[in-house]
């Protein structure tokens, strides 16, 4: 699952405290849907996803993005038990929504990109390494029901 050092935990928690969950969530999910258009099929109920500007301005995309990052914020409090933290969400996405688990990795990578954009020089290679470890572990936890 990925072992987090105390330094990783401090790095992740410190940056997370500065993240605007609403803005970063909407941008992360929006970018996922624009950059990887095949992921849109899981969001047919979201209305207009016909263009990048439609997606980035879509209130349902923003709301769900906020929900996703709020869930991630809960996980940050439980880095040593991500599998347990995401057990129900893994079940939902696997059994009911049939989301390809690869999409969790894509979303994590997009989040890292968004954080890099938002935090610029503060998002050092060391910070990126800790966050990449975390989003990889979260993707693995969300995929656990699939195995």
Swiss-Prot record:
Relate the assembly described in the record.
Heterotetramer of two alpha chains and two gamma chains in fetal hemoglobin (Hb F). The ratio of gamma-G to gamma-A chains in is approximately 2:1 in infant chimpanzee, and 1:2 in the adult.
S-nitrosocysteine modifications at: 94
Its family?
A: Belongs to the globin family.
* Task of the protein: Gamma chains make up the fetal hemoglobin F, in combination with alpha chains.
Q: Which PANTHER family match?
A: HEMOGLOBIN FAMILY MEMBER (PTHR11442), HEMOGLOBIN SUBUNIT GAMMA-1 (PTHR11442:SF52)
Q: What organism is listed for this UniProt entry?
A: Pan troglodytes (Chimpanzee)
Residue numbers of N-acetylglycine PTMs: 2
Residues that the record marks as modified (N6-acetyllysine) are: 60, 83
- Cross-referenced PROSITE patterns: GLOBIN
Q: Phosphoserine: which positions carry it?
A: 45, 51, 53, 140
Q: In which tissues is it expressed?
A: Red blood cells.
The protein in question is named Hemoglobin subunit gamma-1
Q: SUPFAM superfamilies under this entry?
A: Globin-like (SSF46458)
Q: Does the keyword Heme belong to this entry?
A: yes
- Phosphothreonine PTM positions read 13
Q: Which InterPro entries has this protein been placed in?
A: Globin, Globin-like_sf, Globin/Proto, Hemoglobin_b, Hemoglobin_oxygen_transport
Q: Which UniProt keywords apply?
A: Acetylation, Heme, Iron, Metal-binding, Oxygen transport, Phosphoprotein, S-nitrosylation, Transport
A cellular component annotation (GO) from this entry: haptoglobin-hemoglobin complex
